[in-house]
UniProtKB/Swiss-Prot annotation:
High-level lineage: Bacteria, Pseudomonadati, Pseudomonadota, Alphaproteobacteria, Rhodobacterales
Keyword Nucleotide-binding belongs to the record: yes
Name of protein: Protein nucleotidyltransferase YdiU
The species this protein was found in: Jannaschia sp. (strain CCS1)
Active-site annotation: D245 (proton acceptor)
Enzyme category, top tier: transferase
Length: 480
């Protein structure tokens, strides 16, 4: 059966200044690494069985029928500095598919060759970042966190030059859309009100059909990002490059370049090698989200009839982000601690635990997972200094007693909110190093394990473990 994509391309019907129409650049000798057949089925995409043909498809050598390939343009603030034109420098969107349930998704090839937005880059991707995004985006989906997805990964049979000669690869990314804060900024900076209005109408129709106008879209984006960042922080996730061009209007996580998950808890933890001043540190993520959303609000101002009134309205809305985030974050923390009701002092109880983790070298994931078990006192084993936990445990147990929830119910609830397994940085690095040598078995094992992160499985105990000091990853790289 030939490959079939249920394309219905609405972004391609926007004015030409939104994108450049172009096809992916063919590669020499594509080879299939992985294809996500459950996701393909979810999207209503019919795929053949031939690995060779799938490799040609997902490398961009064959463009599927009904596609309308294009590279999108956008702008953005990168580490606070304004870039008036960015865009898809190495990605080509094949088009939009409409899934059997009516949901609409973009299908994009990353590493598809040079575009008009490549800015001196070669338009290609190397194997490491492709595997990292495949692993982490699929792990995030399994964790229940809004995210882009990975449909396929292929090698290209070509070498790309980075810090060394690296094997090339292409990732097929699926997203609710690729509309970014930076997309709005691009047209606002050019005072292109007609394009801004078209983008607003398109975004609302696609993501928030029940809201009205710029105010409604801003409100929806504020809530979506408050919920998203709280979920990130609930699994110790650090995005690492929260530029405005990496914030979606859909509320999905996008662009996994230097991302990482904390092992030992540190509020101001930074992994990204390019984040020299800690702008995007773990605890800074809510403040940066608010800053980015203020840029969205600014970009929407030209669409408001009364600019002065709009500035006042939007300022109040953005200033309200902190309260939205606190509500979402406190809800995440209560669930992680098994607290059913909302009571005064809950947030302080949670923050006290985090402080003790930081003081005592507690592994973020393992501490919460152990608290979810039948012997929560074993959470002390996940600390370098176990004694710091005992006073907190006493206070937590007293708080649990006030909810009067059966132990079995509490355990089940907490284990559904506290994963046993996350994609630990050192395990991802091991996968990449093996794959560069042609061994994809570790990649297959890790991706299989991460499909079910809330279940303890002895066969994956090594993947759950805190890294030894010699294994710990202290810095991550964009790799673009």
């Amino acid at each position: 059966m030939p490959d079939a994509f249920p394309f219905d391309n609405t972004y391609a019907s926007l004015p030409d200044r939104f994108f450049t129409r172009m096809s992916p650049k063919p590669v020499a000798e594509p080879g299939l690494i992985a294809v996500n057949r459950p996701l393909a089925e979810r999207l209503g995409i019919t795929l053949g069985e031939s690995d060779a043909e799938l490799a040609q498809l997902f490398a961009g050598n064959v463009v599927p029928m009904g596609a309308a390939p294009l590279a999108q343009v956008y702008a953005g603030h990168q580490f606070g500095g304004w870039s008036q034109q960015l865009g898809d420098g190495r990605a080509v969107m094949l088009g939009e598919v409409v899934a059997p349930d009516g949901a609409r998704f973009d299908v994009q090839l990353k590493g598809a060759g040079q575009t008009p937005y490549s800015r001196m880059g070669d338009g290609r991707a190397w194997l490491g970042p492709v595997l990292r995004e495949y692993i982490v985006s699929e792990a995030m989906a399994a964790l229940g966190i809004p995210t882009t997805r990975a449909l396929a990964a292929v090698t290209t049979g070509e070498i790309v030059l980075r810090e060394a000669r690296m094997p090339g690869a292409v990732l097929t990314r699926v997203a609710a859309s690729h509309i970014r804060v930076g997309t709005f900024q691009y047209f606002a900076a050019r005072q292109d009100v007609d394009a801004l209005q078209a983008l607003l109408d398109h975004t609302i129709a696609r993501h928030y059909p029940d809201v009205d106008g710029p105010s409604g879209l801003l409100d929806a984006a504020l809530q979506a990002q408050a919920d998203l960042i709280a979920k990130w922080m609930g699994v110790g996730f650090i995005h690492g490059v929260m530029n405005t061009d990496n914030m979606t209007l859909s509320g999905e996580t996008i662009d996994y370049g230097p991302c990482a998950f904390m092992d030992t808890y540190e509020a101001n933890k930074v992994f990204s090698s390019i984040d020299q001043f800690g702008r995007y540190a773990y605890a800074q993520q809510p403040q940066i989200a608010a800053w980015n959303l203020a840029q969205l609000a600014t970009a929407l101002l030209p669409l408001m009839p009364d600019r002065d009134a709009a500035i006042e309205e939007f300022t109040e809305a953005v200033n309200g982000f902190a309260a939205r985030f606190d509500t979402a974050w406190h809800g995440v923390l209560r669930a992680k601690l098994g607290l059913v009701s909302e009571q005064e002092g809950d947030a302080q109880l949670a923050f006290d635990l985090l402080n003790r983790m930081e003081q005592g070298g507690g592994d973020f994931t393992q501490v919460f997972r152990a608290l979810s078990g039948p012997e929560p006192e074993r959470a002390a084993e996940a600390f370098a200094a176990p004694a710091v936990l005992a006073p907190w445990l006493k206070a937590w147990r007293a708080r649990l007693a006030r909810d009067n929830v059966a132990k079995a119910a509490r355990i089940a609830s907490m284990q559904a909110d506290n994963p046993a397994l996350i994609p630990r940085n050192h395990r991802i690095e091991e996968v990449i190093q093996a794959a560069v040598k042609g061994d994809f078995a570790p990649f297959e094992r890790l991706t299989t394990a991460l499909q079910d992160p809330f279940t303890d499985r002895p066969e994956f105990a090594d993947l759950q473990a805190t890294p030894a000091r010699s294994e710990a990853v202290t810095q991550t790289f964009c790799g673009t």
